[in-house]
Swiss-Prot record:
Catalyzes the attachment of serine to tRNA(Ser). Is also able to aminoacylate tRNA(Sec) with serine, to form the misacylated tRNA L-seryl-tRNA(Sec), which will be further converted into selenocysteinyl-tRNA(Sec). One of its GO terms (biological process) is selenocysteine biosynthetic process. GO terms for cellular component: cytoplasm. Homodimer. The tRNA molecule binds across the dimer. Its EC number is 6.1.1.11. ATP binds at residues 264-266, 351-354. Keywords: Aminoacyl-tRNA synthetase, ATP-binding, Cytoplasm, Ligase, Nucleotide-binding, Protein biosynthesis. It comes from Clostridium perfringens (strain ATCC 13124 / DSM 756 / JCM 1290 / NCIMB 6125 / NCTC 8237 / Type A). It is an enzyme of class 6 (ligase). SUPFAM superfamilies: Class II aaRS and biotin synthetases, tRNA-binding arm. This is Serine--tRNA ligase. CDD domains: SerRS_core (cd00770). The keyword Ribosomal protein does not apply. Pfam families: Seryl_tRNA_N, tRNA-synt_2b.
Amino acid sequence: MLDLKKLRSNTEEVKKALSNRGEDFDVNVIDEVIALDEERRKILVDVEALKKQRNEVSAEIPKRKKAGEDVTEVMAEMREIGGKIKADDAKVAELNDKINYIMLRIPNIPNPAVPEGETDEDNVEIKRWGEPTKFNFEPKAHWDLGTDLDLLDFERGGKVAGSRFTVYKGMGARLERSIINYFLDKHTFENGYTEVLPPYMVNRDSMTGTGQLPKFEEDAFKVENNGYFLIPTAEVPVTNMYRNETLEGDKLPIKHAAYSACFRAEAGSAGRDTRGLIRQHQFNKVELVKFCKPEQSYEELDKLVQDAESVLQGLGLPYRIVRICKGDLGFTAALKYDIEVWMPSYNRYVEISSCSNFEDFQARRANIKYKNSPKEKPQFVHTLNGSGVAIGRTVAAILENYQQEDGSVVIPEALKEYMRCDLLK
């Protein structure tokens, strides 16, 4: 959520910044919300005047009673003033609802470093690590390798649940689990994160706090009988752990690493990477979440990207980093980097991690603040998160990049102690 004061004081600047944001968003609603806020502010001034008048009239009652005077008219005036205050309070509550409805649907303001552009083709590559894997044979796709090696069962996943669900079997299940453990060990022992194992279901307030609701409700899986939502990412429960809290400034930054299953309806994604493990309704991921002071957040974003890189480098997987353009930035981020791993069967890089700085956008929605001393006025924290990284896509990348001509797959050195083998065959 944006700062309403900023909308009032920098209206045209904000409208310009949001005009090519890539969201289905009409900048004219900013004028609407400002008009509603002005109306609310005028009524609040009237309410304060009425309360002052009521206090003055109220003070007259004991004086008149003491003097033996009739207070009937004064009491009637009190009731009239009270009725006006009640009516104005109702108007303010109605205006608050209208303002909040609009504010929850206004996207974040892009950082000046965000490139211009409309689609993912306009994202700017800023780094490559490793070289795309070359083969002296025709490489297989990960879904064929997984099936041939009896690691992945797409058919039975479809039978028990539906399309875009997968059963991991035998060494495939062990590979998934080994990657999870490797990522968590790397981030907690080497990168300084505290591990969290969060709930996989959250309430509506949590989904609103991180920005999934109200805009993206159609992409969420909802438990209809009690209002819970299955989490699309551990970002949601981990960020909302601190909802409506004021943190101690000297404890920042707070850094959490969380493994979870993730659940996404992926509405509108038909035909896009729907074969194999790339786009699933249920998948595992290790998420990195940070809470920091505003002046720390862009340095912490750089470190977050490096932490996500570290696990891919440890696995020897070639990747590149792109800075996301305005039109592809999404709803909540002020600045975002995607890390894309090389996938031989696609002959291109495929996203495996997104690392974002939300500045105070989520903190305002979730009311997460900090202060450096007990007497200091609380300020909103900045929140960041990044995939550290997606597990299923890592499985796919390992199968494709480490495959051998005979159809076997070499285990990356970093995973051998977890897998207790050197080769999948």
